[in-house]
Structure formats: C-alpha cells, structure tokens
Amino acid sequence: MATALITGGTSGIGAEFARQLAARGDDLVLVARNPDRLAEFATELKERYGVAVETISADLGVREEVLPVAARVASREQPVDLLVNNAGFGLSTRLTAEDTTPLEYGVEVMIRAVLILGAAAGRAMRSRDHGAIINVSSTAGFVTMGRYSAIKAWVTTYSESLAGELGAGGVTVTALCPGYVRTQFHQRASIRTGSIPGPMWVDRDKVVTEALADVAKGKILSIPTRRFKVMIFAARHFPRSAVRAVSRRMASGRH
C-alpha cells in the first residue's frame, strides 16, 4: 500500500489530493499548521475511506519545523511514495512594499520548504528507484504578475531541474500549474476576482484528477484543462514584452 505525504493537506487543493488518494487506498501523512483541523480531517478520512492517516503540525515558514517533516519524508522504515508539496497562500503585498515580511514568509513556505522537502524525497526515492514528487506551482509562474508569479516561476523551474537531476529512472517530478481554482485561496489573500470570467475557473477535483493522471504518465508539467494549456503555450512563445504588458493589465484589476 502506498503512502502519500501532503503539505497544506487540510484545505483547498491539498485536501482534495488527500480525498482522492485516500479513495484509491493510499495511506496519508498530512502536514498543516492547525492541529485541531488536522485531527478533525484525519478522523473524517479514516472513517470514510478506511486508510491510515498520520498528522504532523508544522509551520513550514520556520526552518526548524520543516526539518522533522523532511525526516519523515526520508524515513526508510516508513517510506513515502508520493510527496505533494502543496502548502502555500496568495500574496497581496507589493514587491516595493516597505515591509517585506509577508513576501519573505512566502519565500520560506513556498520556496525554502519545497527545496528542503524535495531534496529529502529525491534522495530517499532515488535510493529505492521509486516514487513521485508533485510540486504545486501555478500558471501565474508563466506570467509576470508580481510576487506570486516570481515564487511560482521558481517552483516550476525547480521541478524541471529536479526531474533532470533524478534522471529517467523510477522517480518522477511533476509541477502542477493550475489556473484559477475554486477554493478560499483568493479571498484569504484579499485578491479581487470579480473581473475573472466564470469559464476561467476550474473545480479543484478536476485539477487533482488531471494531476494524478499526468503523474502516472510521468509528465513533468501538468496544466489542467485545454484552455490553460493554450494560454501557457502562448505565454511561453509570445514575446516577453507582450507577456509583461498583458500581465500588467491583468494585475491592475485585482488590487
């Protein structure tokens, strides 16, 4: 029976990963900050799906709290077959803000923790020649809409680089790059979404279903829905000056 470790595993895309993986019989290790929510969700999953659910309460913005999670990822006695680096949040602080503390915390959670856990998983999985890593990135990483785009551009490039380092063996790395997903993500970051057309939104169950299918195929980039595949193809091939101009217009309507 496989075991999956999911960071940010009690809400949004992370919770959907937990549900779909539990439904197929995988045991889970859930990582999140709120111990009460972890315990509640773990009980729900165990009762509904009959799988084992381990919980780790950790703030991934604190390096000392990331390291025990990395140790669990690297365990030989209880191997992790799938790492889902999902923990993250929206950022409304501008890059030119006088107080960059929120941006620094975003880097700590969505870059440093991803790097530490990805390294631990990569070593452990390579030693067994088996395993998969999903790093939840974003279509925002292909455009230039400020702080979140910058962080997610790193996540995507890092995932491609890690896949290259691990080679063509039994370990895969996938950067999941969803577009606008129906969760509480934008509201929590106070990001206005009224200007985003309804057809641009994607349900999180569809995002996760497509991601797991892409992982099974060994894909390095997973971009859910044909609409966003076309958009990202354009973003990667249009002149960067055009991408920046469009990004500025998109960003101006969200603050």
Named regions from a protein language model:
Residues 78, 88-104:
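Conserved mid-core segment of classical short-chain dehydrogenase/reductases
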Residues 175, 195-231:
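C-terminal helical subdomain
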Residues 35-36, 57-68, 100:
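The beta1-alpha1 cofactor-binding region of Rossmann-like NAD(H)/NADP(H)-dependent oxidoreductases
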Residues 138:
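Residue(s) in the substrate-gating loop at a strand-loop-helix junction
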Residues 24-41:
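Conserved glycine-rich Rossmann-like NAD(P)H-binding loop of the short-chain dehydrogenase/reductase
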Residues 10-11:
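Conserved glycine-rich cofactor-binding loop
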Residues 118, 151-154:
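Active-site helix of classical SDR
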